[in-house]
Amino acid sequence: TLATSSAASDVYKRQATSCSKNFGLYRDRVGCAMAVCDTADKHAVVARNMAVLNRMNYSFAPDHGAAVVSIILADKDLHAMWEEELTQMRETMLTIRKDLADELRRQCNTDRFDFIADHRGMFSRLGLGKDEVEALREEHGMYVVGDSRINIAGLSGGRHVPFAAAVAKVLAG
């Protein structure tokens, strides 16, 4: 329940979503609770109740993540598996970055995005303006954070090609 019984009638619509299975984090409280109210007064009541529920459930973060890390780092075989997975992930990210930079160079006919291949990590900012980011979303269904930050990992499996094509079209006007 997202609200106490006295506030339940103030909610026009409520929804709870769990993302635990999506991320494989079954005990980490991954999800969202939402409520829509038809007046500001009702919103205030529901918001207060949801804040209380939030405080009761999330005052202290789960500590089992640290326990899992401790077990992995203390066990020679698990530690080796973890290092191998990190190496594979790092190499995958580098490949995606290179492929994306190459495809953007090809489709946009510019070296403007070559820096992407040299970055490290899961995210990069493309240096696109607000209007370009909006055009990617509205015209091509490509969702990019407002400052043009993209998740490199989300462009695996050849998804960098249509993304680069959309960027090229947006830049071409």
Briefly describe each language-model feature range.
Residues 16-18, 22-84:
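Conserved core segment of the aminotransferase class I/II
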Residues 57, 61, 88, 92, ...:
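Catalytic cores of large soluble enzymes that bind and process phosphate-bearing ligands
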Residues 63, 115-118, 144:
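A structural signal for short secondary-structure junctions
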Residues 81-139:
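Conserved PLP-binding catalytic core of the aspartate aminotransferase-like
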Residues 102-106, 128-173:
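PLP-dependent enzyme catalytic core of the Aspartate aminotransferase-like
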